[in-house]
Swiss-Prot record:
NCBIfam families: PRK11783.1. It catalyses: guanosine(2445) in 23S rRNA + S-adenosyl-L-methionine = N(2)-methylguanosine(2445) in 23S rRNA + S-adenosyl-L-homocysteine + H(+); guanosine(2069) in 23S rRNA + S-adenosyl-L-methionine = N(2)-methylguanosine(2069) in 23S rRNA + S-adenosyl-L-homocysteine + H(+). GO terms for molecular function: 23S rRNA (guanine(2445)-N(2))-methyltransferase activity; RNA binding; rRNA (guanine-N7-)-methyltransferase activity. Its EC number is 2.1.1.173, 2.1.1.264. This is Ribosomal RNA large subunit methyltransferase K/L. The gene is rlmL. Its main location: cytoplasm. HAMAP family: 23SrRNA_methyltr_KL (MF_01858). InterPro entries: 23SrRNA_methyltr_KL, DNA_methylase_N6_adenine_CS, RlmKL-like_Mtase, RlmKL-like_Mtase_CS, RlmL_1st, SAM-dep_methyl-trfase, SAM-dependent_MTases_sf, THUMP_dom. Specifically methylates the guanine in position 2445 (m2G2445) and the guanine in position 2069 (m7G2069) of 23S rRNA. It comes from Shewanella baltica (strain OS155 / ATCC BAA-1091). One of its GO terms (cellular component) is cytoplasm. SMART domains: THUMP (SM00981). It holds the Pfam family THUMP.
Length: 709
């Protein structure tokens, strides 16, 4: 009897152990990401050809304690390598694990390589050559907890590569993962009608058809690891292969199970057909191009087993939440009597089905941890009587308090915005504490920003509430889900609010009191326009006529644009970021503003203030709450440093000049006493700079008008 280890993805151990036991293996023992077992050579061949779950099978040649590099070398040297492979065959070492004396896998592989080469030489045999790519004989070594296991790769290339796949879709499902879905769902034990409405390249259906037609999954593989093993019995292997071919031929003819696959992408359906044809099961599967939400059950009962789109796969989160919710609704209404088994990595999407799972398991799709949930659908079951709206769900069903509030807000603010002459504004700002998000409307798009939840609220609760928000929004405010953009906002430190989120740009032009501004809805956490400063920008414009205007920490220069449109004699725009200076220039161009009177400066604002000798009639400054950018000489804290900052700025202010100072620190306290002693007048103007759409959040910013005493 020979000792083996069958490797598989994490989460497969139980299913794989059962499969090996059914094959007739003995001493079956589950381990991490695999199963140890004992088998005869004949049975090992059969397992290699027929396993649907294992990724790799290795023949254990040596296993023992190892506490030094010398012991590692000796362990490998004691193996009779010339009895295992010819010196004419190339070989390679695949080494895994570190610890103790061994902190480098490359060193471990080198020690074993040296031992193998020395063993050949000491037996007066010319040494074999190492090949890092496509070696003919592969040694697999694992070091863990002071134990070294040296094995031969018995199966060869990964066993999930059946040989029928021509190319893959955007998000391919590994064949052995599809097989495990079929096993754990219960379908393999009692096969019946099978439907996959997101079939992609057809993997789930093809694996199921191979099972039902008694076709060995390894029958089309062209290479196996044991082919260059000296103890390989070609006659026995060939006999097992011929037997499998005969069973396959008979199995296809006898198979009476019906398989149905569909996908909305016609290219993937064509690919699925090619793969099924390559696997020899095309005649068993009916493929169609169809939307999963429109298909009808092909039988009164059966299994719906699928791997639908999710975050790491395809689609944006808002659309996916809508899709999952409507899928759950369809399953409940139309698939009574069916079992549904679904693989998904996103708990929010799974919860949006609004179905109660009979079983919940973990599986890994590559390195990605996924939930595999099984649902039993009962006949004549409905979730509700009210219909699903075309672009979303019934608002009475999901987060009614949130839905009703934002619907009311949107209706009120839409009329106000038209009257104001703006098309970008906030329609919800954590009005209801349980739904801790801000929702901003930019033309016909909305951005949803999730605030960091208190640590006392369980993550599962916050995720469920967020998914309910995203589900309720489309019908509540009449927006297409594909025009919803989700962002997560936390407390910003330093320049984190300006870090890029997405290389892809979704750019729009928004209008504000006659000014035009370029927006980037996806590139950064912020869009290029701070909506809460809308009235402050207008105030700057109203105060600018005939004046020399300075805008510091200018961001994208929107206040500078208002100043220029307001008739400023000159406008100087200063920001540390080249990106935002370029953006400010774009905004000026959008408004037809050009000329030498408009100056753009890329510089550390604090240093620029210290170096400046000019005088200005109007200064606007909206500094960050805190910054420690590498480009700045010192860190900046608006609470700590505002007195020094304002006293320096007043020196640049003409005798009749005005300084508009704003910041977003919620608990900011202006040191009026110290500034008054410095002959500086300070007046809070929050009441005239807080827009209507931010009245629900009066602490969003604070604004001050500062002059010489």
């Amino acid at each position: 009897m020979l000792n083996f280890f069958a490797a598989a993805p994490k989460g497969f151990e139980y299913s794989l152990a059962q499969e090996l036991t059914e094959f007739g293996a003995t001493e079956v023992k589950e381990s991490v990401a695999g199963v140890y077992f004992t088998a005869s050579l004949t049975l090992a061949y059969r397992i290699t050809l027929w396993t649907r779950l294992a990724s790799r099978i290795v023949l254990v040649i040596y296993k023992g304690s190892c506490e030094s590099a010398e012991q590692l070398y000796n362990a490998a040297y004691c193996v009779d390598w010339p009895a295992h492979f010819s010196n004419k065959s190339t070989f390679s070492i695949d080494f895994h694990g570190t610890g103790g004396f061994l902190n480098n896998t490359q060193f471990g592989a080198l020690k074993i390589k040296d031992a193998i080469v020395d063993r050949f030489r000491d037996d007066d045999i010319e040494r074999p050559n190492v090949s890092r790519v496509d070696a003919e004989f592969k040694v697999d070594a694992h070091f863990r907890n002071g134990v070294i296991t040296i094995a031969m790769n018995f199966s060869g290339p990964s066993l999930h590569q059946r040989g029928y796949r021509s190319t893959t879709g955007e998000a391919p499902l590994k064949e052995n993962l599809a097989a495990n879905m079929l096993v754990r769902s219960g379908w393999q034990a009692s096969p019946s009608t099978l439907l996959d409405p997101f079939c992609g390249s057809g993997t789930v259906l093809i694996e199921a058809a191979l099972m039902a037609a008694d076709i060995a999954p390894g029958l089309q593989r062209s290479r196996f690891g044991f082919e260059h093993w000296r103890r390989h019995d070609k006659a026995v292997w060939q006999e097992i292969v011929e037997e499998a071919k005969a069973r396959a031929s008979l199995g296809v003819k006898r198979c009476e199970i019906k398989f149905y696959g569909s996908d909305i992408d016609s290219r993937l359906v064509a690919l699925a057909k090619r793969n099924a044809e390559n696997a020899g099961v095309l005649e068993l599967i009916e493929f169609n191009v169809a939307d999963a939400l429109t298909i009808a059950p092909p039988a009164e009962s059966g299994y719906l087993i699928t791997n639908p789109p999710y975050g790491e796969r395809l689609g944006n989160v808002s659309e996916l939440l809508q899709l999952y919710y409507q899928l759950g609704d369809k399953f409940k209404k139309e698939f009574g009597g069916w079992k549904v088994a679904m693989l998904c990595s996103d708990i929010e999407l799974v919860s949006s089905l609004k179905l109660k799972a009979d079983k919940q398991m973990k599986m890994f799709n590559g390195a990605l941890e996924c939930a595999f949930n099984i649902y039993t659908l009962h006949a004549n079951s409905t979730r509700r009587d009210t219909p699903v709206l075309p672009d979303g769900v019934d608002i009475a069903d999901i987060a009614p308090a949130f839905a009703n509030r934002i619907k009311k807000n949107a209706k009120l603010l839409e009329k106000w915005a038209k009257k104001e002459g703006i098309d970008s504004y906030r329609i919800y700002d954590a009005d209801i504490p349980e739904y801790n998000v801000a929702v901003d409307k930019y033309l016909d798009y909305v951005i949803i920003q999730e605030y960091m939840a208190p640590a006392t609220i369980p993550e599962a609760v916050t995720k469920r509430r967020l998914s309910d928000v995203l589900l309720a929004l489309p019908s509540a405010i009449g927006i297409n889900p594909n025009k919803m953009i989700m962002k997560t906002r936390e407390r910003q430190k330093g320049t984190s609010q300006y870090q890029k989120l997405d290389e892809r740009k979704l750019e729009l032009i928004t209008t504000e009191y006659g000014a035009k501004f370029k927006l980037n809805l996806t590139g950064y956490l912020d869009t290029g326009l701070f909506l809460d400063h809308r009235l402050t920008r207008r105030l700057v414009g109203q105060k600018s006529k005939g004046r020399r205007v300075l805008n510091l920490f200018s961001y994208t220069g929107s206040a500078s644009v208002h100043a220029a449109l307001g008739g400023a004699k000159s406008v100087t725009t200063v920001d540390m970021s080249n990106t935002y200076i370029a953006w400010a220039k774009d905004n000026f161009a959008l408004n037809g503003l050009q000329g030498k009177q408009y100056e753009f400066v890329q510089s550390d604002c604090m240093q620029w203030i210290r170096d400046c000798n000019e005088q200005y009639d109007l200064i606007f400054i909206d500094p960050p709450t805190f910054s420690n950018s590498k480009r700045m000489e010192d860190s900046f804290d608006v609470q700590r440093d505002h007195v020094n900052l304002l006293s320096s700025l007043v020196k640049l202010l003409s005798p009749t000049g005005e300084l508009v100072f704003s910041n977003n620190k919620r608990k900011f306290k202006m040191d009026i006493e110290t500034l008054t002693k410095m002959n500086i007048n300070v007046t809070n103007i929050d009441d005239v700079t807080l827009p209507m759409d931010y009245k629900r959040n009066p602490h969003i910013h604070n604004t001050w008008l500062i002059t010489h005493a």
